[in-house]
Protein backbone atom coordinates (compact mmCIF):
# COMPACT_ATOMS: atom_id res chain seq x y z
CA UNK A 1 0.00 0.00 0.00
CA UNK A 2 1.41 3.41 -0.98
CA UNK A 3 1.84 6.27 1.48
CA UNK A 4 -0.83 8.30 -0.33
CA UNK A 5 -3.35 5.46 -0.15
CA UNK A 6 -2.51 4.94 3.52
CA UNK A 7 -3.13 8.63 4.27
CA UNK A 8 -6.46 8.62 2.44
CA UNK A 9 -7.71 5.73 4.57
CA UNK A 10 -6.41 7.09 7.87
CA UNK A 11 -9.07 9.72 8.59
CA UNK A 12 -12.03 7.41 8.02
CA UNK A 13 -10.44 4.61 10.00
CA UNK A 14 -9.67 6.94 12.93
CA UNK A 15 -13.29 8.13 13.15
CA UNK A 16 -14.67 4.61 13.02
CA UNK A 17 -12.16 3.33 15.57
CA UNK A 18 -12.95 5.82 18.34
CA UNK A 19 -16.75 5.69 18.41
CA UNK A 20 -18.18 5.13 21.88
CA UNK A 21 -14.89 5.20 23.79
CA UNK A 22 -15.92 8.08 26.06
CA UNK A 23 -18.96 6.18 27.32
CA UNK A 24 -16.81 3.11 27.91
CA UNK A 25 -14.28 5.12 29.93
CA UNK A 26 -17.08 6.53 32.11
CA UNK A 27 -18.52 3.07 32.83
CA UNK A 28 -15.07 1.62 33.62
CA UNK A 29 -14.31 4.54 35.95
CA UNK A 30 -17.62 4.07 37.78
CA UNK A 31 -16.94 0.36 38.32
CA UNK A 32 -13.38 1.08 39.48
CA UNK A 33 -14.67 3.57 42.06
CA UNK A 34 -17.24 1.03 43.30
CA UNK A 35 -14.53 -1.62 43.50
CA UNK A 36 -12.24 0.72 45.46
CA UNK A 37 -15.07 1.39 47.92
CA UNK A 38 -15.70 -2.34 48.38
CA UNK A 39 -12.01 -3.22 48.47
CA UNK A 40 -9.88 -0.24 49.60
CA UNK A 41 -6.79 -2.44 49.49
CA UNK A 42 -6.58 -1.93 45.72
CA UNK A 43 -5.30 1.59 46.42
CA UNK A 44 -2.10 0.17 47.93
CA UNK A 45 0.86 -0.89 45.79
CA UNK A 46 0.41 -4.53 46.76
CA UNK A 47 -3.34 -4.50 46.13
CA UNK A 48 -2.93 -2.77 42.77
CA UNK A 49 -0.19 -5.23 41.79
CA UNK A 50 -2.32 -8.24 42.66
CA UNK A 51 -5.31 -6.84 40.78
CA UNK A 52 -3.29 -6.12 37.63
CA UNK A 53 -1.74 -9.60 37.77
CA UNK A 54 -5.21 -11.15 37.70
CA UNK A 55 -6.33 -8.76 34.96
CA UNK A 56 -3.23 -8.99 32.74
CA UNK A 57 -3.87 -12.42 31.11
CA UNK A 58 -7.45 -11.39 30.30
CA UNK A 59 -6.17 -8.15 28.77
CA UNK A 60 -3.75 -10.10 26.57
CA UNK A 61 -6.39 -12.51 25.29
CA UNK A 62 -8.82 -9.63 24.72
CA UNK A 63 -6.18 -8.00 22.53
CA UNK A 64 -5.58 -11.32 20.77
CA UNK A 65 -9.28 -11.66 20.01
CA UNK A 66 -9.67 -8.00 19.05
CA UNK A 67 -6.87 -8.32 16.48
CA UNK A 68 -8.96 -10.81 14.53
CA UNK A 69 -12.33 -9.14 15.10
CA UNK A 70 -10.92 -5.86 13.78
CA UNK A 71 -9.91 -7.81 10.67
CA UNK A 72 -13.40 -9.26 10.29
CA UNK A 73 -12.60 -12.64 11.85
CA UNK A 74 -12.78 -14.43 15.17
CA UNK A 75 -10.91 -17.25 16.92
CA UNK A 76 -12.13 -20.06 19.13
CA UNK A 77 -8.59 -21.25 19.85
CA UNK A 78 -7.61 -18.58 22.39
CA UNK A 79 -8.13 -20.80 25.43
CA UNK A 80 -6.19 -23.78 24.06
CA UNK A 81 -3.35 -21.45 23.01
CA UNK A 82 -3.18 -20.10 26.58
CA UNK A 83 -3.00 -23.67 27.87
CA UNK A 84 -0.32 -24.61 25.35
CA UNK A 85 1.74 -21.53 26.24
CA UNK A 86 1.56 -22.46 29.92
CA UNK A 87 2.50 -26.08 29.18
CA UNK A 88 5.47 -25.16 26.95
CA UNK A 89 6.75 -22.72 29.57
CA UNK A 90 6.45 -25.28 32.36
CA UNK A 91 8.09 -28.11 30.38
CA UNK A 92 11.01 -26.17 28.89
CA UNK A 93 12.15 -23.62 31.47
CA UNK A 94 13.41 -26.28 33.85
CA UNK A 95 15.34 -28.11 31.12
CA UNK A 96 18.32 -27.42 28.85
CA UNK A 97 16.60 -24.49 27.14
CA UNK A 98 16.43 -22.52 30.37
CA UNK A 99 14.16 -19.58 31.08
CA UNK A 100 15.06 -17.53 28.01
CA UNK A 101 14.89 -20.55 25.72
CA UNK A 102 11.51 -21.46 27.18
CA UNK A 103 10.27 -17.93 26.55
CA UNK A 104 11.42 -18.15 22.92
CA UNK A 105 9.73 -21.55 22.57
CA UNK A 106 6.42 -20.12 23.84
CA UNK A 107 6.66 -17.10 21.53
CA UNK A 108 7.64 -19.22 18.51
CA UNK A 109 4.77 -21.65 19.12
CA UNK A 110 2.25 -18.82 19.32
CA UNK A 111 3.56 -17.10 16.19
CA UNK A 112 3.88 -20.27 14.10
CA UNK A 113 0.50 -21.76 15.05
CA UNK A 114 -1.19 -18.41 14.54
CA UNK A 115 0.48 -17.86 11.17
CA UNK A 116 -0.39 -21.38 10.01
CA UNK A 117 -4.03 -20.86 11.01
CA UNK A 118 -4.09 -17.50 9.24
CA UNK A 119 -2.60 -19.03 6.10
CA UNK A 120 -5.30 -21.70 6.01
CA UNK A 121 -8.03 -19.08 6.46
CA UNK A 122 -6.56 -16.61 3.96
CA UNK A 123 -5.27 -18.88 1.21
CA UNK A 124 -7.98 -21.56 1.28
CA UNK A 125 -10.76 -19.00 1.87
CA UNK A 126 -12.19 -20.99 4.78
CA UNK A 127 -14.30 -19.45 7.59
CA UNK A 128 -12.10 -18.46 10.52
CA UNK A 129 -14.60 -19.76 13.06
CA UNK A 130 -14.46 -23.28 11.57
CA UNK A 131 -10.67 -23.35 11.17
CA UNK A 132 -10.06 -22.09 14.71
CA UNK A 133 -12.64 -24.50 16.15
CA UNK A 134 -10.77 -27.40 14.55
CA UNK A 135 -7.48 -25.86 15.64
CA UNK A 136 -8.68 -25.62 19.22
CA UNK A 137 -9.08 -29.41 19.39
CA UNK A 138 -5.65 -29.99 17.86
CA UNK A 139 -3.92 -27.51 20.18
CA UNK A 140 -5.70 -28.94 23.23
CA UNK A 141 -4.56 -32.41 22.22
CA UNK A 142 -0.94 -31.29 21.84
CA UNK A 143 -1.05 -29.62 25.27
CA UNK A 144 -2.35 -32.83 26.85
CA UNK A 145 0.32 -34.91 25.10
CA UNK A 146 3.09 -32.62 26.35
CA UNK A 147 1.71 -32.48 29.90
CA UNK A 148 -1.12 -34.95 30.67
CA UNK A 149 -1.68 -33.48 34.14
CA UNK A 150 -0.75 -30.24 35.94
CA UNK A 151 2.95 -30.04 36.67
CA UNK A 152 6.22 -28.82 35.25
CA UNK A 153 8.40 -26.05 36.57
CA UNK A 154 8.64 -22.28 36.29
CA UNK A 155 11.66 -20.59 37.95
CA UNK A 156 10.80 -19.00 41.27
CA UNK A 157 12.53 -15.75 40.34
CA UNK A 158 10.32 -15.43 37.24
CA UNK A 159 7.18 -16.03 39.29
CA UNK A 160 8.36 -13.43 41.80
CA UNK A 161 9.12 -10.94 39.03
CA UNK A 162 5.84 -11.32 37.15
CA UNK A 163 3.49 -12.20 40.01
CA UNK A 164 5.15 -10.60 43.02
CA UNK A 165 4.34 -7.39 44.88
CA UNK A 166 5.36 -4.95 42.14
CA UNK A 167 3.14 -3.74 39.26
CA UNK A 168 5.25 -5.41 36.55
CA UNK A 169 2.12 -6.71 34.82
CA UNK A 170 0.76 -3.18 34.44
CA UNK A 171 4.07 -1.92 33.05
CA UNK A 172 4.15 -4.80 30.56
CA UNK A 173 0.63 -3.95 29.43
CA UNK A 174 1.61 -0.31 28.87
CA UNK A 175 4.63 -1.50 26.87
CA UNK A 176 2.50 -3.80 24.70
CA UNK A 177 0.00 -1.01 24.00
CA UNK A 178 2.90 1.27 23.05
CA UNK A 179 4.24 -1.34 20.63
CA UNK A 180 0.76 -1.73 19.16
CA UNK A 181 0.58 2.03 18.63
CA UNK A 182 3.87 1.91 16.73
CA UNK A 183 2.69 -1.05 14.65
CA UNK A 184 -0.55 0.75 13.85
CA UNK A 185 1.46 3.59 12.30
CA UNK A 186 2.72 1.21 9.60
CA UNK A 187 0.79 0.45 6.39
CA UNK A 188 0.43 -3.17 7.53
CA UNK A 189 -1.02 -2.10 10.88
CA UNK A 190 -3.49 0.27 9.26
CA UNK A 191 -4.35 -2.51 6.84
CA UNK A 192 -5.84 -4.55 9.70
CA UNK A 193 -8.56 -1.93 10.14
CA UNK A 194 -8.95 -1.20 6.44
CA UNK A 195 -9.29 -4.87 5.48
CA UNK A 196 -11.86 -5.44 8.21
CA UNK A 197 -13.87 -2.32 7.41
CA UNK A 198 -14.00 -2.65 3.61
CA UNK A 199 -12.01 -5.57 2.15
CA UNK A 200 -12.81 -4.71 -1.47
CA UNK A 201 -11.90 -1.05 -1.06
CA UNK A 202 -8.76 -1.96 0.88
CA UNK A 203 -7.68 -4.39 -1.86
CA UNK A 204 -8.17 -1.74 -4.51
CA UNK A 205 -6.10 0.66 -2.41
CA UNK A 206 -3.22 -1.80 -2.43
CA UNK A 207 -3.67 -3.42 0.99
CA UNK A 208 -2.20 -6.98 0.93
CA UNK A 209 -5.33 -8.60 2.36
CA UNK A 210 -3.94 -12.14 2.72
CA UNK A 211 -0.71 -10.96 4.33
CA UNK A 212 -2.63 -8.76 6.76
CA UNK A 213 -4.82 -11.70 7.79
CA UNK A 214 -1.83 -14.01 8.33
CA UNK A 215 -0.01 -11.36 10.40
CA UNK A 216 -3.17 -10.77 12.47
CA UNK A 217 -3.46 -14.46 13.30
CA UNK A 218 0.27 -14.71 14.07
CA UNK A 219 0.18 -11.79 16.51
CA UNK A 220 -3.02 -13.11 18.06
CA UNK A 221 -1.36 -16.48 18.65
CA UNK A 222 1.68 -14.76 20.15
CA UNK A 223 -0.42 -12.77 22.64
CA UNK A 224 -2.43 -15.82 23.69
CA UNK A 225 0.71 -17.92 24.19
CA UNK A 226 2.33 -15.16 26.26
CA UNK A 227 -0.81 -15.00 28.39
CA UNK A 228 -0.28 -18.70 29.04
CA UNK A 229 3.33 -18.07 30.05
CA UNK A 230 2.16 -15.43 32.53
CA UNK A 231 -0.47 -17.78 33.98
CA UNK A 232 2.22 -20.45 34.40
CA UNK A 233 4.39 -17.91 36.22
CA UNK A 234 1.46 -17.11 38.53
CA UNK A 235 0.87 -20.74 39.45
CA UNK A 236 4.48 -21.92 39.25
CA UNK A 237 3.54 -24.80 36.95
CA UNK A 238 1.67 -25.71 33.78
CA UNK A 239 -1.87 -27.01 33.30
CA UNK A 240 -3.16 -28.38 29.96
CA UNK A 241 -6.69 -27.07 30.52
CA UNK A 242 -6.04 -23.85 32.44
CA UNK A 243 -6.92 -21.67 29.45
CA UNK A 244 -10.44 -23.03 28.93
CA UNK A 245 -12.36 -19.97 30.28
CA UNK A 246 -10.31 -17.51 28.23
CA UNK A 247 -11.94 -18.23 24.87
CA UNK A 248 -15.38 -16.88 25.73
CA UNK A 249 -13.99 -14.26 28.11
CA UNK A 250 -11.79 -12.88 25.32
CA UNK A 251 -14.85 -12.43 23.10
CA UNK A 252 -16.84 -10.90 25.96
CA UNK A 253 -14.05 -8.44 26.82
CA UNK A 254 -13.61 -7.37 23.19
CA UNK A 255 -17.37 -6.86 22.76
CA UNK A 256 -17.59 -4.88 26.01
CA UNK A 257 -14.74 -2.76 24.67
CA UNK A 258 -16.72 -1.82 21.57
CA UNK A 259 -14.96 -4.06 19.05
CA UNK A 260 -17.41 -4.99 16.30
CA UNK A 261 -17.91 -8.49 14.91
CA UNK A 262 -18.01 -7.26 11.32
CA UNK A 263 -14.50 -5.79 11.33
CA UNK A 264 -12.94 -2.35 11.21
CA UNK A 265 -14.75 -1.03 14.29
CA UNK A 266 -13.11 -0.63 17.69
CA UNK A 267 -9.69 -0.05 19.18
CA UNK A 268 -7.11 -2.01 21.11
CA UNK A 269 -7.56 0.51 23.95
CA UNK A 270 -11.24 -0.36 23.93
CA UNK A 271 -10.52 -4.09 24.09
CA UNK A 272 -8.18 -3.57 27.05
CA UNK A 273 -10.78 -1.39 28.78
CA UNK A 274 -13.37 -4.09 28.07
CA UNK A 275 -11.14 -6.66 29.76
CA UNK A 276 -10.69 -4.30 32.71
CA UNK A 277 -14.45 -3.80 32.95
CA UNK A 278 -15.08 -7.55 32.84
CA UNK A 279 -12.42 -8.20 35.48
CA UNK A 280 -13.77 -5.50 37.79
CA UNK A 281 -17.37 -6.68 37.28
CA UNK A 282 -16.43 -10.19 38.36
CA UNK A 283 -14.68 -8.86 41.47
CA UNK A 284 -17.51 -6.47 42.36
CA UNK A 285 -20.12 -9.23 42.06
CA UNK A 286 -17.95 -11.44 44.28
CA UNK A 287 -17.77 -8.76 47.00
CA UNK A 288 -21.53 -8.15 46.72
CA UNK A 289 -22.14 -11.83 47.44
CA UNK A 290 -23.33 -12.97 44.01
CA UNK A 291 -23.30 -16.74 43.62
CA UNK A 292 -21.23 -18.12 40.70
CA UNK A 293 -24.42 -18.89 38.76
CA UNK A 294 -25.75 -15.36 39.32
CA UNK A 295 -22.40 -13.95 38.20
CA UNK A 296 -22.62 -15.83 34.90
CA UNK A 297 -26.19 -14.63 34.35
CA UNK A 298 -25.25 -11.02 35.16
CA UNK A 299 -22.22 -11.17 32.86
CA UNK A 300 -24.36 -12.50 30.03
CA UNK A 301 -26.99 -9.80 30.46
CA UNK A 302 -24.38 -7.05 30.59
CA UNK A 303 -22.67 -8.33 27.44
CA UNK A 304 -25.98 -8.57 25.56
CA UNK A 305 -26.73 -5.03 26.68
CA UNK A 306 -23.31 -3.83 25.55
CA UNK A 307 -24.05 -5.14 22.05
CA UNK A 308 -27.75 -4.28 21.87
CA UNK A 309 -27.79 -0.73 23.27
CA UNK A 310 -25.41 0.82 20.69
CA UNK A 311 -27.30 -0.98 17.90
CA UNK A 312 -30.66 0.32 19.13
CA UNK A 313 -29.28 3.84 19.53
CA UNK A 314 -27.89 3.70 16.00
CA UNK A 315 -31.26 2.66 14.59
CA UNK A 316 -33.00 5.37 16.61
CA UNK A 317 -30.67 8.05 15.22
CA UNK A 318 -31.20 6.75 11.69
CA UNK A 319 -35.00 6.77 11.96
CA UNK A 320 -35.23 10.05 13.87
Across the structure, where does each feature detected by a protein language model lie?
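Transmembrane alpha-helical segments in multi-pass inner-membrane proteins
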Residues: 224, 238-300
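Alpha-helical transmembrane segments within multi-pass membrane transporters and channels
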Residues: 96-137, 273-278
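Alpha-helical transmembrane segments of multi-pass integral membrane proteins
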Residues: 30, 35, 39, 161-195, ...
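Interfacial loop-to-helix junctions that mark the boundaries of transmembrane helices
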Residues: 13-21, 45-53, 97-101, 157-169, ...
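Hydrophobic alpha-helical transmembrane segments
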Residues: 21-26, 51, 59, 80-84, ...
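Cytosolic-side transmembrane-helix boundaries in multi-pass membrane proteins
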Residues: 1-33, 37, 177-179, 197, ...
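Transmembrane helix-bundle core of multi-pass membrane transporters
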Residues: 124, 128-186, 212-215, 234-243, ...
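Single transmembrane alpha-helix segments in multi-pass membrane proteins
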Residues: 30-41, 45-96, 120-124, 254-268, ...
